Amino acid sequence: MLFNLKNRHLLSLVHHTPQEIQFLLQLAKELKQAKYTGTEQPRLKGKNIALIFEKTSTRTRCSFEVAAYDQGANVTYIDPNSSQIGHKESMKDTARVLGRMYDAIEYRGFKQAVVNELAEYAGVPVFNGLTDEFHPTQMLADVLTMMEHSDKPLSDIIYVYIGDARNNMGNSLLLIGAKLGMDVRICAPKALQPEAELVAMCQEFAQQTGARITITEDVELAVKGVDFVHTDVWVSMGEPLESWGERINLLLPYQVTPALMQRSGNPKVKFMHCLPAFHNCETEVGKKIAEKYPHLANGIEVTEEVFESPMNIAFDQAENRMHTIKAVMVASLA
């Protein structure tokens, strides 16, 4: 089935149909196979792509750059310290300048309104590499990864996101599950559940696709029978360590442990994480946390036992960022 996604933005997946999302996933699968077999054909020769990063990144930057190079495109990396964006020049003006020079723009930053403004004024496709509200390229990678690790049709796959569900991962996993007719469960304390407006929108999508949506504080209910357990960091890197105590106490019952995974009752259950993950105290941040909260020395949102077990497929997710991002660029620019 063919879809024309030429010159389409990727801002949140709200405005993509289920069929368009599945087309991108199938294209990513084909591009991945071509890369593995050495038969990939560069379809973006002569294209120039600007990568705006107001937030630092490993996976997103590398995925966009390698995907672009594989397809013959050129990229320019722009960070806050090497441009006038937001200092002497508005995003609206930046969009109108870069749109004259580049064939597409990627943005990774804070507010969803900023990437929407870029899309409104650039005159070229804009791709959301992450905002506080949504993380669409991660969602495509997550679903591709779940497809690879399950022999079920999408509509039969059951997954749970557990932890702080107010963030871009909680929002986006709820959205794409609703769009694709999946069984999606969001498990978080009441204060950290997705906004009611987003939930209502996803419930409407679910009525059209047959998705099953569960939003609950009950860990037992949420994990029963799931195929995949997703989580993310509990505290943003910008927040001072002193403020972590209340959040940690609130989320400790939602830590992904071997016992939690076993409560799924599924011997094939897999663990997923968009990374980076605080699963030990080997990083600078991990050491500081372990000093202040010794009971978390073996992991914060996920324990070392789960992360280093065969259940963990987070590195497959990380690789699939590249393949799905490549699919987005090829579909929009080729």
Curated annotation (Swiss-Prot):
GO cellular component: cytoplasm
Protein name as annotated: Ornithine carbamoyltransferase, catabolic
Family per similarity comment: Belongs to the aspartate/ornithine carbamoyltransferase superfamily. OTCase family.
Described purpose of this protein according to its UniProt entry: Reversibly catalyzes the transfer of the carbamoyl group from carbamoyl phosphate (CP) to the N(epsilon) atom of ornithine (ORN) to produce L-citrulline.
Keywords, comma-separated and alphabetical: Arginine metabolism, Cytoplasm, Transferase
PANTHER family (alphabetical): ORNITHINE CARBAMOYLTRANSFERASE (PTHR45753:SF2), ORNITHINE CARBAMOYLTRANSFERASE, MITOCHONDRIAL (PTHR45753)
GO MF, one annotated term: ornithine carbamoyltransferase activity
Organism: Avibacterium paragallinarum
High-level lineage: Bacteria, Pseudomonadati, Pseudomonadota, Gammaproteobacteria, Pasteurellales
EC number: 2.1.3.3
Keyword Cytoplasm assigned: yes
A biological-process GO annotation: arginine biosynthetic process via ornithine
Keyword Nucleotide-binding: no
